[in-house]
Structure formats: structure tokens, C-alpha cells
Amino acid sequence: MLPSLTIIDDFLSDPWAARRAALALRYALPGTGRNYPGRDSTSALEVDGINAAVSRHIGIDLAGAEGTEHGHCRLTLKSDKGRSGVHVDPAFYSGILYLSRPEDCVKPGAGGTDFFRHKRTGLERVPTNGAELAATGYDNLDDLVGTVVNKDTTQPSKWERVMRVPIRFNRLLLFSPWQFHNSAPGFGTDPESGRLVMLLFFAKAKG
């Protein structure tokens, strides 16, 4: 069974080169139809061997999940707002590589990634087997996700934060995508000082 959460510090051998490359990518304009705050790069950041490195760490061969923004970067400033909140990811496993400057990571209010419990149901993740699903009283996962996650995503009073993984330059956070999570608020006033991350959405490698 995959670990629900793993933190790997000092992940890249040259994180400053990755950061420069991430900032050099083209980014979509804020509010261009997505639900998240901030803006995503229009192409992936090229980091040689990242899929293989994560595969070795968890002991399962992984590839980028089709239909996701695997490898793309996200830039979020303090002023950016989004429509969605707590969510799950459409992937086998998820990851976030933090690329904000060290001095910005330690400023008050500079958050990493938050994990939540749904107050009404007591759930911290989507059930992973039939027995767990039956215990929730829901007949299928679609109904559960629709009425727990999608319905309450933007209602903070429905959720209790159970953990915040602090942001740290060159920290890789790996986690089960079925845990209820959300990015902590953005920060900074420009790309240099903002919240900069590389998004990773993994699928099992074919073959």
C-alpha cells in the first residue's frame, strides 16, 4: 500500500536551475476558466528523471497521468483568488515540488499544502474499498464525491484542517490524491516572490 504522505527535502540536485526554468515558462492569464487561484504554465517543466526518481522511492513504476497537467508549474500570488477549495485529484498518486525562494517560504502566511476532515462525515479521504464505502452510507463513489467534495468545496465551515505541510524550497511532497486537500494561500506580489510549485499527477506505468 502506498504511503498516504511522504516528504522528501532537498529533492533536486540543482533546484535553482529548475526554478529559473519554471519562471521562464509561459503562464496562462489568471481567471481563464480554471477553478484554482493563480495561473498554470502552458507547458511542462522539463526535469530529467523525475518520474523514475519517484518510482524508485515508492517502489512502483509511474508515468504522468494522461489528461492532467503533470509537470506543469503553478504561480500563485497573495492577490489571486479561485472558485474551488478542498478537492481530490484524478490520479493514482500526486506530488508537489515547492520552488519558491527560501526567504519567501519562511515569511508569515507562506503556506504549503493543507489536508482536511469533512465535519459531517468525519472522512479525511475518499474510501478506497467497498467496506469503507459501505460504512459511509453512500452507494457509490460518484455520489460521495459529489455531495461531500464538490458540494462543500468552497464552504470552509464544512471542513476542519487536520494538517499543514509547510512549504520549503526544493521540498517534494508526495501524497494519496484521494485525501481531501488544498493549497495553502498564495503569497508575494510578483513571480519572484510568489508561491511557485511544480504539479505532479502520476499513473501506473503501462507494461
Enumerate the predicted regions with their spans.
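Non-heme Fe(II)/2-oxoglutarate
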Residues: 1-84, 109-113, 119, 128-132
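Catalytic core of non-heme Fe(II) oxygenases with the double-stranded beta-helix
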Residues: 79-207
